[in-house]
A protein has these predicted regions:
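Active-site-proximal helices and loops of the catalytic beta/alpha 8
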Residues: 2-7, 23-36, 45, 49-64, ...
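Active-site-adjacent "subsite" loops/lids of carbohydrate-active enzymes
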Residues: 178-223, 234
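Aromatic/His-enriched, Gly/Pro-containing loop or helix-boundary segments
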Residues: 62-88
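Soluble non-cytosolic domains of exported or imported proteins
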Residues: 15-22, 76, 80, 207, ...
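Core domains of carbohydrate- and sulfate-ester-processing enzymes
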Residues: 118-193
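Active-site-proximal N-terminal segment of extracellular/periplasmic enzymes that hydrolyze or transfer
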Residues: 16-23, 27, 107-109
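Boundary/entry segment of secreted carbohydrate-active catalytic domains
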Residues: 1-18, 196-205
Length: 482
């Protein structure tokens, strides 16, 4: 995919009006026109309540089709509306990636009794006290769906842990007891063992669970004619299962079926270890780069821009990195809040959209709105998306050689007329830098397209020119079309 761009088509605070799928269908042509090549849609299945964003999973087979949890539709609409949106996206040449939430379930239909041990929330390997009988919300019969699509019913023994025990009068994490019951290996080591995240923790060591989830993966991909998946909460899921799961889905859908995982850690080595564990079968969101962008936006001119890409996934594994600025987890008010400050977002998007490496993802909240308030960044994003589609080709030459003013050039190529560009970013004062765009551009007239400068410049005989940028801004210089 040449210069592909993903869009995350939701944010955390969308209204519970059931209209997102209809909006997405109507928006498909516009997305194509601005250069979006794939859309990551939110969790499409029934949650424990209608207003939930989809991560509090109740029934993975209910895509807004059955009357369950007091509603037929999900927060985003009905199954029929979803299918129409997917069709519209495909008609416009846009791939569809499903948000795949397999780690946890909640909203059980009835309680069950079982033996469990409370564990220390800061060290889940540390048991607090002897096993006791508890009553938890772990039984799932799916009365609205019955056996349609799958006869599988969930019980306490399909989970490794739970916080869905209430008769004790406190919210605690319990390790469920029974044959073979333990926290999974192949998960993040935070809190001793980070298998458990929330709700009822799906046991990926249980053979019935493994087979059912693999079957579901094929079903959901085929049912929605999906082109890929965004895999949620990988820190908490046994990595061997993910490798097996993706192998199984691709056996059905083809080896080109795409997958990107969410491994929320700013530590590059943790992401590298995960990629090794799953044999590099999937891409990962470049969380280390996100945290770099967040820190840079917080520190302003005190941040050393020369280090912006150090120890990031896109620097070390460029073909496996999905670059992003913000998402629903990082936005203000979310549990993992680390929202990049508004002044720096144009610089951050200029970086990820115009650089050669990485697969950039544009956040709905940055392009459209967050909490219903229109985004101020849409105009600059339209400019950058157009530049990516028409200008960002050829080899890249980096100029990360100043603590406050950095940039790169793209040389362009013969297949894309007028391609090539020069990008400068400044987190301090006005800056300038002599950069080379290549002798093939000698004597061309270039201009700045974000509105920072009205003047033009001429590329020298040696392919170099003095490019300028205003303080705290970005500048994108391109050839002026005849």
């Amino acid at each position: 995919m040449k210069n592909g761009v993903m869009m995350q088509y939701f944010e955390w605070n969308l209204h519970n009006d059931g209209k997102l799928w209809v909006q997405l269908k109507e928006d498909a042509k516009h997305l194509h026109d601005i250069g979006i090549t794939s859309v990551w849609i939110p969790p499409a299945y029934k949650a424990d309540e209608q207003q939930d964003e989809g991560y509090a999973v109740y029934d993975l087979y209910d895509l807004g089709e059955f009357d369950q949890k007091g509603t037929v539709r999900t927060k985003y609409g009905t199954r029929h509306e979803l299918e129409e949106a997917v069709t519209a996206l495909h008609e416009n040449g846009i791939a569809v990636y499903l948000d795949t939430v397999m780690n946890q379930k909640t909203g059980a239909d009835y309680t069950e009794k079982f033996m469990a041990c409370e564990v220390d929330p800061e060290n889940r390997e540390q048991v607090i006290g002897a096993p006791v009988e508890v009553e938890g919300w772990t039984g799932y019969s799916f009365p609205g769906r019955g056996d349609k699509y799958s006869p599988f019913k969930w019980h306490w023994y399909h989970f490794s842990g739970t916080d869905q025990v209430y008769e004790t009068g406190k919210r605690a994490i319990y390790l469920i007891q029974g044959e073979g019951k333990k926290w999974s290996e192949g998960v993040d080591g935070e809190n001793g063992n980070y298998d458990f995240l929330i709700f009822n923790d799906v046991d990926f060591d249980h053979p019935e669970v493994v087979e059912e989830m693999k079957r579901w993966g094929v079903w959901i991909a085929q049912t929605l004619d999906a082109d890929g998946m965004r895999l949620d909460a990988l820190k908490h899921i046994k990595n061997a299962f993910i490798a097996d799961f993706m192998h199984n889905v691709r056996a059905s859908r083809g080896k080109e079926f795409y997958a990107v995982g969410e491994y929320w850690s700013g530590d590059f080595e943790s992401l590298e270890a995960y990629l090794d564990a799953v044999d590099h079968q999937i891409d990962l969101f470049d969380a280390p780069l996100h945290f770099k962008l967040f820190t840079a936006s917080q520190q302003g001119r005190d941040f050393d821009m020369r280090t912006l890409l150090d120890d990031t996934l896109v620097q070390k594994y460029p073909t496996l990195a999905v670059t992003f600025v913000d998402n629903h987890d990082s936005q203000r008010g979310s549990s993992l809040e680390s929202q990049v400050k508004s002044w720096f977002k144009p610089l951050a998007y200029g970086l990820i959209l115009l650089m050669k490496e990485g697969y950039p993802c544009v956040f709905y909240g940055d392009y459209y709105s967050m909490k219903g308030e229109g985004s101020p960044h849409r105009p600059i994003l339209d400019i950058l998306l157009d530049a990516r589609r028409s200008r960002a080709f050829g080899e890249q030459t980096d100029y990360f050689d100043h603590p406050n003013t950095v940039g790169f050039t793209r040389s362009g190529d013969a297949q894309h007329p007028d391609s090539g560009l020069a990008l400068l970013l400044s987190n301090g004062e006005d800056g300038e830098k002599v950069m080379s765009v290549g002798v093939m551009h000698a004597n061309e007239t270039w201009h700045e397209i974000t509105g920072s400068y009205d003047d033009e410049l001429t590329i020298g005989d040696d392919g170099k020119a003095l490019f300028k940028v205003h303080g705290g801004k970005l500048a994108v210089w391109v050839r002026k079309k005849d």
